Amino acid sequence: MLVLIVNIKAKSEKTELIKTELLKLVEETYKEVGCTKFDPHQEEEDPSSFWLYEIWETEAHWKAHMETEHVKHFLAFFDENVEKFDVRRAEKLI
């Protein structure tokens, strides 16, 4: 099992665009083989910050996800619209 916590910090004027595109990404991602969880969150104190909690059956499933057209579309506009993007791996303790 692969657990990822992703932080996406939108440029303040691009918050709604990132939110819209992120929700499209979620819909497509849940159709993928190996996706156990792909849940987006928006910070209450800083609405331009989004968090994704992802669980994949294997790293190979996640790598295949990163090569899909919907992920490539989402990543294509990062330079102009995203201030920060960070991916962290986590290990379930229990």
Features from the language model and the residues they span:
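Absolute protein N-terminus
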Residues: 1-2, 94
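Short, glycine- and small/hydrophobic-rich beta-strand elements in well-ordered beta-sheets
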Residues: 27-49
